[in-house]
Amino acid sequence: MMENYKHTTVLLDEAVNGLNIRPDGIYIDGTFGRGGHSRLILSQFGEEGRLLAIDRDPQAIAVAKTIDDPRFSIIHGPFSALGDYVAERDLIGKIDGILLDLGVSSPQLDDAERGFSFMRDGPLDMRMDPTRGQSAAEWLQTAEEADIAWVLKTYGEERFAKRIARAIVERNREQPMTRTKELAEVVAAATPVKDKFKHPATRTFQAVRIWVNSELEEIEQALKSSLNVLAPGGRLSIISFHSLEDRIVKRFMRENSRGPQVPAGLPMTEEQLKKLGGRQLRALGKLMPGEEEVAENPRARSSVLRIAERTNA
């Protein structure tokens, strides 16, 4: 069934170019998806290149297993654990580049059975890995009203969060919601002011999905691990699709592109300064999709690619 869903990889060439591929390098594609980035990376390798791909979606793993290439291997798990995967293979400090394409993919959105979309009726699931953790329906049925409101406000930036949370709890008390259409209808009815250009359930679905999959924590942990696993000169190439993701990536790159912040006038020896270490990253800028790509793939509109390089510090 999954092969019926077309996936157009956003900023494909730009993200891979950002890795500055070495033919004999070792790289990580932390979000294999349907393999667009991985296949392009493999095409730029020599015989000694090595690509470790990661994904927690079983459907992505099934696609990855069709790649018959000794330079390629796939891991079923969250990219937040990339530090562990690298350590298990004795590759700490040897990784030449890490690519992350954040958020939900088109095949996940377009498959009603995955429960990510308010546009298609399906089970209210939303898990990247349906074999682990609580589904969206299970969480919404057990969560406190205040907790639901907090999630909607924090992860969806939903201004009617309290009103929507109350409606969700009341509906679940009457009859537990199990379908995406049911949640979308409850949210729409609880939203007093409609946005002309956006479905009223957009922010709620985003927020619940992020919460169910711990998406922002996953990003923060992966970024933190990247500093340990990257070789000097190794690249980070990260595509984000909304402001919450991009804010985390931007802040991480900015903070690690500065040296230690020492108060002016604080007496320190050269040896003490050396122990503090220098900046760990060099930010190489950001890219956004051009008009042509957005016209071909409207979902690319909000994407931002940020690139950074590991220093020798």
From Swiss-Prot:
GO terms for biological process: rRNA base methylation. This is Ribosomal RNA small subunit methyltransferase H. It is found in: Cytoplasm. GO terms for molecular function: rRNA (cytosine-N4-)-methyltransferase activity. It comes from Escherichia coli O7:K1 (strain IAI39 / ExPEC). The keyword Methyltransferase applies. It comes from the Bacteria. Specifically methylates the N4 position of cytidine in position 1402 (C1402) of 16S rRNA. The keyword Transferase applies. Its EC number is 2.1.1.199.
